[in-house]
């Protein structure tokens, strides 16, 4: 079985998290940090799906091995899905989490519809092009002031009703059980043996016109 994957990130927290979810499988996980300087992927897509695939395919081609990448962010209903793919840069390319939260609060001032969702898309690509994609979301509401000191990004503003708290008021362990990213990783790990077999077949083949993904229950492209 093919047993080498690169996780398209230099964030070691993401690497550790991913390794925990696939710990029971005979696979070696590398990160971009293991390969030295590499050309950066251009994430100019208009959707999370596009950016996750662009990143996964880019690093898969550069390194010649399967790559896994994710793209995630906050989608606010009253803002037509914004911040969306610009979640990390909502207040500018060099914006801090606090800057982004302040801009979101300003945009939402006086708005009664506070519905929002965190969205995460994970893409697994091989050098010739075929990919699997997994997507999950977590719904909540945007408060009119931050609460809590845990987490990062928009967590202090994202109120999760089942817990009666914001994501910044709960532990990382609690968050991972219900968050968009945690759900995606649980879906992937539930059928990771199938994913590895799929990769073994696809890693050296030419890109088919329409890859067959119907065997994957939770893979969105199979629908």
Region annotations inferred by a language model:
Residues 2-6, 12-221:
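Anionic-ligand binding patches
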